A protein has these predicted regions:
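Transmembrane beta-strands of outer-membrane beta-barrel proteins
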Residues: 35-41, 87-93, 156-162, 216, ...
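Membrane-embedded hairpin module used as a gating/binding unit in multi-pass transport
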Residues: 215-223, 230-243
Length: 379
């Protein structure tokens, strides 16, 4: 009887899972205990920075600029999938677009001053660093869930998923350098390395950039008899894309390159030099692992939860609550501390819709996102 009670509780929990985690990761353990056929579709988008309004990222940054010491982060994610489920199996066609930009305070300050056409006190030193990585891909993913028994008070669900991906676009960039403000501008010395699948250069060998790869997802859920559960998900574990025929360039800018004229006098000129690879490159991209852990505890008609996401060394803590209106409907409310977004959601046994933003005025929001899921069982 106790075993049946835990299994029933697990199936009720999974039938209307709320994706409160900021990264909205896939958890293959959701499929454990499922029965029958079904179809589903989902779409998710997140635009987030922690130093400027997301919609103004390509603008002049204006009043929304609020940098901080250390790494200033910008993330763009869009995912869509549609597929079928059968018992504890799930097969889906997927689309992924993911970008991450990490820059230090000196670089974003330097960009801001130039966007705003602001003068800077002479002698100010900027040590700039930038890392950027992004890709787009489509493919297929197969998930499988497994049910295990821990003891009389708890069940364990496990899951694994494998994706086969075809890349459609990629870009990888690193930049570093130093700039010193002067009365008339800047003295600078900087280097950029950039591989962009959409770039074209003179004399480059013919070829069309293309990518292929795979991704491994793992998940686990522990469900206790009193209704509490711990959810763990790791996406893109031991995963990679191989990009063929990638253009590549390295550029160096120096404001004080030594030159001697015909009379032998020394003077300094600003120069911009670069080397474009004639032969296209093969680049192996290790997809960054993404993880999420969340603990839910029931309290009457409410569930209280706390958790955190993780990616590339960055943490995304969240706190929230879920209110059970009745057996078919739930609402959710959560807050993330990294981008300071408030998330609200509504959950039905057949669909989920949630949105988040760091401001009621989307144009001023440093982060905003939307998630929609529909699951229809064939009864």
């Amino acid at each position: 009887m106790k075993k049946y009670g835990i299994s029933l509780l697990a199936s009720m929990t999974f039938a209307s899972t709320t994706h409160a985690d900021l990264l909205v990761l896939s958890n293959p353990a959701d499929m454990a205990g499922k029965q029958g056929w079904g179809t589903y579709t989902s779409a998710y988008e997140l635009m987030a920075t922690d130093f400027v309004a997301a919609k103004n990222f390509n603008g002049n940054w204006g009043q929304s600029y609020s940098p901080h010491e250390g790494t200033n982060l910008a993330i763009g994610m869009a995912r869509a999938e549609a597929g079928i489920t059968y018992d504890s199996w799930r097969l889906a066609g997927i689309y992924r677009s993911e970008q991450i930009i990490a820059a230090n305070r000196d670089l974003v300050d330097l960009i801001y001053y130039n966007k705003q056409h602001q003068s800077v006190t002479a002698g100010q030193i900027f040590n700039a660093n930038l890392y950027a990585e992004g890709f787009m891909a489509k493919g297929l993913r197969l998930d499988k869930g497994f049910e295990l028994k821990l003891n009389d008070n708890a069940d364990l669900s496990l899951g694994a998923g494998i994706s086969l991906l075809q890349g459609t676009r990629a870009r990888f960039a690193n930049a570093s350098g130093t700039a010193v403000s002067t009365a008339s501008g800047y003295n600078y010395n900087a280097t950029l390395t950039d591989s962009n699948s959409r770039a074209t250069y003179p004399y480059i060998s013919p070829g069309t950039p293309e990518g292929s790869g795979y991704a491994l997802d793992l998940g686990a859920k522990v469900i206790w008899t009193q209704g509490a559960h711990l959810d763990l998900a790791v996406n893109d574990l031991f995963s990679q894309m191989i990009w063929h025929n990638m253009p590549n360039t390295m550029e160096t800018a120096n404001s004080a390159t030594l030159v001697r004229n015909a009379a032998g006098y020394v003077y300094f000129n600003p120069t911009l030099s670069g080397i474009n690879s004639i032969n296209r490159l093969t680049i192996v991209q290790k997809l960054p692992a993404q993880a999420n852990a969340q603990f839910n505890y029931p309290a009457g008609d409410f569930d209280l939860f706390a958790g955190t996401g993780w990616m590339m060394g960055y943490w995304f803590p969240q706190l929230g609550t879920i209110y059970r209106i009745n057996e078919d409907w739930k609402t959710s409310l959560d807050y993330d501390t990294q981008f300071k977004t408030l998330g609200i959601g509504i959950v039905h046994k057949y669909f989920t819709l949630s949105a988040r933003s760091s401001s009621l005025a989307i144009g001023n929001a440093q982060a905003y996102g939307l998630n929609a899921e529909v699951h229809i069982p064939f009864e």
